[in-house]
Amino acid sequence: MNSWWTYVNRWIFSTNAKDIAILYLLFGLVSGIIGSVFSFIIRMELSAPGSQFLSGNGQLYNVAISAHGILMIFFFIIPALFGAFGNYLVPLMIGAPDVAYPRVNNFTFWLLPPALMLLLISALTEEGPGGGWTVYPPLSSITSHSGPAIDLAILSLQLTGISSTLGSVNLIATMINMRAPGLSLYQMPLFAWAIMITSILLLLTLPVLAGGLFMLFSDRNLNTSFYAPEGGGDPVLYQHLFWFFGHPEVYILIMPAFGVVSHIIPSLAHKPIFGKEGMLWAMLSIALLGLMVWSHHLFTVGLDVDTRAYFSAATMVIAIPTGIKIFSWLATLTGGAIQWSRVPMLYAIGFLILFTIGGLTGVILSNSVLDIAFHDTYFVVAHFHYVLSMGALFGLCGAYYWSPKMFGLMYNETLASIQFWILFIGVNIVFGPQHFLGLNGMPRRIPDYPEAFVGWNFVSSIGSVISILSLFLFMYVMYDQFTSNRVVKTNPYLIPSYFDDNVIFVNEKLGVAQSIEWLLHSPVHEHAFNTLPTKSI
């Protein structure tokens, strides 16, 4: 009984940022698996023209799409990249004993499982929410979705919003007030900065989403007409409010991945990151510009031509700081003693390639004239999946990089690299052909299509099967890591270096590192620092 209570005390009532981070990671993986199941349903339905599995039920197809989008964004990438890595690594990197508000941190996590339950109940209620992850009225209004499904989905999103807001306040307070003596904000590692910028974006945009969703809720239940034209409202208002959150949201999703890659590449190329200040200002610029471009999602609603010109230009400008980041990573790789075959390095290189492709299609879509043709086609789907399903997801596989530090156990590098190649090939086969479908005008969110599109759709669905196989292999790699007892006590990525004058931190027992967390014991003790670390130079 006592051991059971210890277990509950550690995992349910936890105030330790590292334990909460592991809960976040586990929660994110479970949600990601459920989201992958929904995506598999979508791809199987589209594997051939006509009705395949959903017996012609278009509403059910749209429910699968809504569930897939919301699960992957709010319940997979944010908890896993922002929640898990943010909580685990930020306090270690800045030399803090924990986050600023440990109990709020616990509450922040435990808001998510009820939110997930609400979303899944919503999908199973009456006809389910068929509005996509964007939940646009009038499709999401009481006239089109009369049951409680959309209300439950709105409530679920509000809970995740509260969770992210509290988590952001917590991490910002931690970074401002709890840095090790002598460590200035400017000297923080890039990952900590990425989390800081992500938190600021969340705090600025989530209240707008909350307001927009609450007005939708009151339109549905309290007889207001914010978005109902018959009462003097305007559905386009919702689109503005939603995308003012929704566009910074995509930078919120990718920013921690930027931070992860900025640690993996220097560590495995044995060089300091190229242009750390430039990288930092690039991230800040991306965040600032990201708040100023939301209407590029609305080019088709009849905006003024000057407005379209501004939003096109502003969107293209984001390519500049993004390019700075890509070229700085490439410059870091140049001339380094690179460990090409290490799994985190494979993911970092994959990230660079695929994120660049996603960025290029983004520049195409930023042209308002072209976007009017491409809007709501599979070209857009291919674009943002290259950025998210390959950018954020490959960044998330930085879990491979830090997992020996988190668990003190090494993964099987051979299996993990096989898993990388299967995933890399799989996602490209899924989303590459979707560019061609979009160029030919195949619309999004439609469960059927003319036979002319069958070729590339079939290829795409084959890719989906390959990706799901890589997911199963990933689960086995995790199982193997926890059961095969390959204990790691030091930094597993260190190799003997004969010309190493770039050492930043040294610990006699554990070797050298570019950021402080690698100098700690693996797995990190509950109290990582016996005394506060002090920066001497």
Swiss-Prot record:
GO terms for biological process: aerobic respiration; mitochondrial electron transport, cytochrome c to oxygen; respiratory electron transport chain. Heme a3 binds at residue 383. It is found in: Mitochondrion inner membrane. Its cofactor is heme; Cu cation. Mg(2+) binds at residues 375-376. Pathway: Energy metabolism; oxidative phosphorylation. It is an enzyme of class 7 (translocase). There is a cross-link at residues 247-251 (1'-histidyl-3'-tyrosine (His-Tyr)). O2 binds at residue 251. Ca(2+) binds at residues 45, 48, 50, 447. It is a multi-pass membrane protein. Fe(II)-heme a binds at residues 68, 385. Its main location: mitochondrion. Component of the cytochrome c oxidase, the last enzyme in the mitochondrial electron transport chain which drives oxidative phosphorylation. The respiratory chain contains 3 multisubunit complexes succinate dehydrogenase (complex II, CII), ubiquinol-cytochrome c oxidoreductase (cytochrome b-c1 complex, complex III, CIII) and cytochrome c oxidase (complex IV, CIV), that cooperate to transfer electrons derived from NADH and succinate to molecular oxygen, creating an electrochemical gradient over the inner membrane that drives transmembrane transport and the ATP synthase. This is Cytochrome c oxidase subunit 1. It comes from Schizosaccharomyces pombe (strain 972 / ATCC 24843) (Fission yeast). The lineage of its organism: Eukaryota, Fungi, Dikarya, Ascomycota, Taphrinomycotina.
